[in-house]
Amino acid sequence: MFSEVKVLQIVLVQWLTLFSFTYNSHGTYILDGSAVFNENSYLVLTNTTKHSYGQAFDNTTFEMKDQSFSINFFFAIVPEHKQQGSHGMTFAFSPTRGLPGASSDQYLGLFNKTNNGKTSNHVIAIELDIHKDEEFEDIDDNHVGININGLRSVASASAGYYDDNDGSFKNLSLISGKLMRLSIVYSHPDTKLDVTLCPAEFLVPPRKPLLSLNRDLSQYVLKHMHIGFTASTGSIRALHYMVLVYTYPEAVYQPLEFGRVPTLPPYPKKPSDRLRTVLAVCLTLALFAVFLASGIGFVFYLRHKKVKEVLEEWEIQCGPHRFSYKELFNATKGFKEKQLLGKGGFGQVYKGTLPGSDAEIAVKRTSHDSRQGMSEFLAEISTIGRLRHPNLVRLLGYCKHKENLYLVYDFMPNGSLDKYLNRSNTNENQERLTWEQRFKIIKDVASALLHLHQEWVQVIIHRDIKPANVLIDHDMNARLGDFGLAKLYDQGFDPQTSRVAGTFGYIAPEFLRTGRAVRVKFF
């Protein structure tokens, strides 16, 4: 009935995509890459390693130039995990008995990065592609394509077929695990190539092909070509089954029928996998017992010691986000000493990383009953908590837990300005600021003050500007921070100062005389 019939079967090997088939003679095919014959006379195109490829090309030649032909083969892909395939395979016409230098993964064991797309390849392939590669402009991860000299298909369509009865399109999944038939028919007088996909139980493919290409293939091929298969694996595992049938060298749809469509075996498991499964079950039960005991213990713990985080009246009007104590505890690794950035009369500042992200933060912890602790805490939240400016340290949120108050800021990797200005003997390696950097820092602080005094809806008086409160970010931009002594006023309101606030240091002469500051200085 057929000029030549060759049955292809897969060797079931776990963890990898394998293409295997038996046929009349070992000498019929030339193997390359990972392709080998195993002890059962099966041809395995890929071995048990990831990112491998294999090739099997017929040693005899097939006359294609100015010729018609019809080729059919049956295949099935059984993935290890549902809805996840590998990269796919191709049926190819090649001028040589193999394709040297081919690569795995998206190159399907057919081409490589260098020769992909070159007209000198003289290769025509039908790809069964189950991985969408943007590099090759794939339409999806479940399609059939016609490729000429490269992996960017000249024609492609999602896997499926057109019903002969009503003409509707029926989708097929290439990784469904079901046996399918692919028919390739080329008519030389019409220079038309038709590719049709359908279920294996169809005696004859549907009349309307899935793909059609009106092109004279003689311009791309040599007179004599070799027929073969290529396949590649990536990091996703699956099993690929194929049954290949060569039909007459004519443009006909040859009836093909199985006595019974083969039932594909389930995905295989090695003996070691059974042991691994038993161990996994035992480990799961043990972990479940541990978690159950831990959960019961945690419930009893909560009954005796509850950490309540209830919003107080003053928090309702606050702008920034409230963090839970647990978030800050985990971020700072339990407020460990090695996370400490600095400390003083205000409390301690710790470095941390927010759980679930790479965002670095600085957490300032002060005591609720410390000197001006609560008032400074509220001042920070009510002022900088609602401000967003590139030269102001951003307050991300706050937390109140037991006797302690916490403020969360963006982390400034270069620390405060005073460490650059006051270089001690123990910090002689600290880099010096250039005059350009110093001038930029002055402008940054001025920009922050302009925003506070004139640009925002209210006037904010910082009242404690000093090098220790000017922080430097990773780009050496200055940011003004520590608004614990800040005061809010409405625009146009003239505040009456009753006492000096801030850190002792330089005090303007008018403060000593009147207790009030003026904008203009005379020296």
Swiss-Prot record:
<keyword id="KW-0732">Signal</keyword>
<keyword id="KW-0547">Nucleotide-binding</keyword>
<keyword id="KW-0723">Serine/threonine-protein kinase</keyword>
<dbReference type="InterPro" id="IPR017441">
    <property type="entry name" value="Protein_kinase_ATP_BS"/>
</dbReference>
<keyword id="KW-0325">Glycoprotein</keyword>
<comment type="similarity">
    <text>In the C-terminal section; belongs to the protein kinase superfamily. Ser/Thr protein kinase family.</text>
</comment>
<dbReference type="GO" id="GO:0005886">
    <property type="term" value="C:plasma membrane"/>
</dbReference>
<feature type="glycosylation site" description="N-linked (GlcNAc...) asparagine">
    <location>
        <position position="171"/>
    </location>
</feature>
<keyword id="KW-0808">Transferase</keyword>
<dbReference type="InterPro" id="IPR011009">
    <property type="entry name" value="Kinase-like_dom_sf"/>
</dbReference>
<dbReference type="Pfam" id="PF00069">
    <property type="entry name" value="Pkinase"/>
</dbReference>
<keyword id="KW-0675">Receptor</keyword>
<feature type="domain" description="Protein kinase">
    <location>
        <begin position="335"/>
        <end position="523"/>
    </location>
</feature>
<feature type="glycosylation site" description="N-linked (GlcNAc...) asparagine">
    <location>
        <position position="47"/>
    </location>
</feature>
<feature type="topological domain" description="Cytoplasmic">
    <location>
        <begin position="301"/>
        <end position="523"/>
    </location>
</feature>
<dbReference type="InterPro" id="IPR001220">
    <property type="entry name" value="Legume_lectin_dom"/>
</dbReference>
<feature type="transmembrane region" description="Helical">
    <location>
        <begin position="280"/>
        <end position="300"/>
    </location>
</feature>
<dbReference type="GO" id="GO:0030246">
    <property type="term" value="F:carbohydrate binding"/>
</dbReference>
<dbReference type="GO" id="GO:0106310">
    <property type="term" value="F:protein serine kinase activity"/>
</dbReference>
<dbReference type="InterPro" id="IPR050528">
    <property type="entry name" value="L-type_Lectin-RKs"/>
</dbReference>
<keyword id="KW-0067">ATP-binding</keyword>
<keyword id="KW-0430">Lectin</keyword>
<keyword id="KW-1133">Transmembrane helix</keyword>
<keyword id="KW-1003">Cell membrane</keyword>
<dbReference type="InterPro" id="IPR008271">
    <property type="entry name" value="Ser/Thr_kinase_AS"/>
</dbReference>
<feature type="binding site">
    <location>
        <position position="364"/>
    </location>
    <ligand>
        <name>ATP</name>
    </ligand>
</feature>
<keyword id="KW-0418">Kinase</keyword>
<feature type="signal peptide">
    <location>
        <begin position="1"/>
        <end position="27"/>
    </location>
</feature>
<keyword id="KW-0472">Membrane</keyword>
<dbReference type="GO" id="GO:0005524">
    <property type="term" value="F:ATP binding"/>
</dbReference>
<dbReference type="GO" id="GO:0004674">
    <property type="term" value="F:protein serine/threonine kinase activity"/>
</dbReference>
<dbReference type="Pfam" id="PF00139">
    <property type="entry name" value="Lectin_legB"/>
</dbReference>
<feature type="binding site">
    <location>
        <begin position="341"/>
        <end position="349"/>
    </location>
    <ligand>
        <name>ATP</name>
    </ligand>
</feature>
<feature type="glycosylation site" description="N-linked (GlcNAc...) asparagine">
    <location>
        <position position="59"/>
    </location>
</feature>
<dbReference type="InterPro" id="IPR000719">
    <property type="entry name" value="Prot_kinase_dom"/>
</dbReference>
<dbReference type="InterPro" id="IPR013320">
    <property type="entry name" value="ConA-like_dom_sf"/>
</dbReference>
<comment type="similarity">
    <text>In the N-terminal section; belongs to the leguminous lectin family.</text>
</comment>
<protein>
    <recommendedName>
        <fullName>Putative L-type lectin-domain containing receptor kinase V.6</fullName>
        <ecNumber>2.7.11.1</ecNumber>
    </recommendedName>
</protein>
<feature type="region of interest" description="Legume-lectin like">
    <location>
        <begin position="28"/>
        <end position="242"/>
    </location>
</feature>
<feature type="glycosylation site" description="N-linked (GlcNAc...) asparagine">
    <location>
        <position position="112"/>
    </location>
</feature>
<feature type="topological domain" description="Extracellular">
    <location>
        <begin position="28"/>
        <end position="279"/>
    </location>
</feature>
<keyword id="KW-0812">Transmembrane</keyword>
